[in-house]
Amino acid sequence: MLKRCILAENRKLHASPIWAMFFVLPILSAVYGTFNYLQNLEILTDGWYSLWTQHTLFYSMFFFPAMVSTYAAYLWRLEHLGHNWNLIMASPVPPLDLFAAKFAVVAKLALLTHSFVFALFVFCGKVFAQLPGLPPVTLPLFLLRGLLGALAVIAAQLVLAMVIRSFAVPIFLGLLGGITGIFISSKGFGLLWPYSLMQLGMNSNKSADTLAGSYGLFAFSCLLWLAAMFALAWLLLRRQDVRA
């Protein structure tokens, strides 16, 4: 049943307007990051690492939360129309399978987005910044860590989009979560807030590894928030009053 749900969610993406955002926002982030790097070469002297911080800081703080929030709101949009929610609750499909299917689809989109961001990073580094060689192997590791941290954000946004029928409000809350995440991280409490995890994983504001010696705690926090969001979704779906 879960596989059928995933296939159904994937069909929603065919000719979807969210693909325009998928391409535009990472390109805007890359343009801004590259421009900022080239304008501050006297300060940003750490080559690929410095360019990485400029490319990923605003991406992880603004662009990615906005994209994930939009992905989640778009996938729940059909269920919130008319009496569709009542039909879903009466169907033989386990409600949590529906949530898990949406999670799988948004996670796939996040993986594609991260891959596109990294491709733009390498392209800008070679063509515009003219950096020597290839990016250090630690940078793809940062990307994978960021994807792990992103899973908590995805689950949180799917819960918000599930309980809030408005399309815009969950997106606003996602942006707010990303902004508060940078402040919480700066105070040293990033592992306690799901919207900080992706920023920490991407190492988006420092050249030095911010998670050195804390990989276990980071992974635990990501999995804990992910499990908490799935548990919350399960409880809400069991009550069958999300539409209200």
Predicted regions, residues:
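Helix-loop-helix units of permease transmembrane domains in multi-pass membrane transporters
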Residues: 75-107
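Membrane-helix interface segments
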Residues: 17-19, 82, 94-96, 100, ...
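Aromatic- and glycine-rich beta-strand/loop motifs that create alpha-glucan
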Residues: 1-26
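Pore- or pathway-lining transmembrane helices of multi-pass membrane proteins that form conduits
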Residues: 21-26, 164-182
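Cytoplasmic juxtamembrane interface segments
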Residues: 1-7, 76-89, 147-170
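Terminal transmembrane helical anchor/hairpin motif
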Residues: 35-52, 171-244
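Secretory targeting signals
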Residues: 26-68, 100-164, 204-207, 213-219
